[in-house]
Curated annotation (Swiss-Prot):
PROSITE patterns: CYTF. This is Cytochrome f. The lineage of its organism: Eukaryota, Viridiplantae, Streptophyta, Embryophyta, Tracheophyta. It comes from the Eukaryota. The chain crosses the membrane at residues 285-305. Belongs to the cytochrome f family. GO terms for biological process: photosynthesis.
Amino acid sequence: MQNRNTYEWTKKMTRLISVLVMIHIITRTSISNAYPIFAQQGYENPREATGRIVCANCHLAKKPVDIEVPQSVLPNTVFEAIVKIPYDTQMKQVLANGKKGALNVGAVLILPEGFELAPPDRISPEIRQKTGNLYFQNYRPNQKNIIVIGPVPGQKYSELVFPILSPDPATDKEAHFLKYPIYVGGNRGRGQIYPDGSKSNNTVYSASATGRVSKILRKEKGGYEITIDNKSDGGQVVDIVPPGPELLISEGELIKVDQPLTNNPNMGGFGQGDAEIVLQDPLRVKGLLLFLASVILAQIFLVLKKKQFEKVQLAEMNL
């Protein structure tokens, strides 16, 4: 009986711990690491009419990103799209709780219509090894040509390999043998602004009024309440600084409106780029190969004919 009670207690505790772990993962992801989710929730299309990728609305710092794709691909073929997000992996960023931690990365890949993420059974072992344990998803269930990834650890995945399947015009009437553009956006680190317009703790905080700093209160859970004696109306203004940024001002200091109260803790940033890829017609490739073969054969026959002519000339001279 006692063994049975112990078993039931252990079973309940295991369930409780599992639930707590899941809650922690969900809340931590949604607060500090969920930048692809923010874009998916807020925008029908990640690329605006101006060509700007919407991730730049939250990630204000501009950083480089690069994409490598083959110059051309055949229909119904799996190929690699490599997105490179370079940064110093030794850097630490401010997390949502104000502590320092490693940077994570994410990317959105906007392919031409008809191109999509390769199904698992079409991915070769070589490409599978390069993609690692990455989990790719479509931006929308009906937008298979737009793929998002992240957040993932930047120290391990500063180079992301997307396995892509090209369309086949023989079965897809919307696909054509043309040159197509591919767009990519990639970021490292957390954003500075949330989709609702509020600031994260990964950005600089500025004074909302001109006056003297009369009080700086350090909050119990981190962050500051800064009281400013407003010079214009004689009242007081309280600016809230969350945990993370470091103060640049002190009590008694005269400050101006929009003057930075803190440093800028952001270590990351967003970048976007593009590339071109040609969906090549196999018949055109075969035709080109036949043409090249005919040119080579013509050259060989010309050389042989020339040698034969030289032999005839030499024989006539000897007569």
